[in-house]
Amino acid sequence: MKKIITPLLACLLIAGCSSAPKTKTETASCSYTQEGLMTATYDLTAENNDITVLSLKMIYDKSMFGDIDFTTITEDMKGVTTKVEIEDTIIATIEMNLKEADPDTLKNLGFDFSNTDMSFDKVVQDMKDQGFDCK
């Protein structure tokens, strides 16, 4: 009996020590609409409650375009991808990989996350408190 239990316990010990901690991935999509002006949708992805990817999609009435400056957005920013579509509406999409993007680059785009609690739960709750519909 001892000969069976000892190898079994050794296997369990090895299996327990070699397992990596699980990464908890969460997502949320939060939208807000100002009738006749714009719709903003934030898509959030988090690992272990830390936001890793933040995507912002803004849809404006074409008449609002004069108030938006997209000249600072370029395609070569590490961790930031952008897309602007102009038809009957203006659709601007900015996706930021917060693990890769340079904080100064984000500041230049108007996204200053320094001294900000970027935990998934906090950001989603703050957005709900500001009137966003989060799913």
Identify what each model region corresponds to.
Residues 8-9, 19-22:
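Hydrophobic membrane-targeting and insertion signals
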Residues 21-135:
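Subset-of-secretome marker
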Residues 1-4, 8:
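Positively charged n-region of N-terminal signal peptides that target proteins for export
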Residues 14-16:
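C-terminal motif of bacterial Sec signal peptides marking the signal peptidase cleavage site
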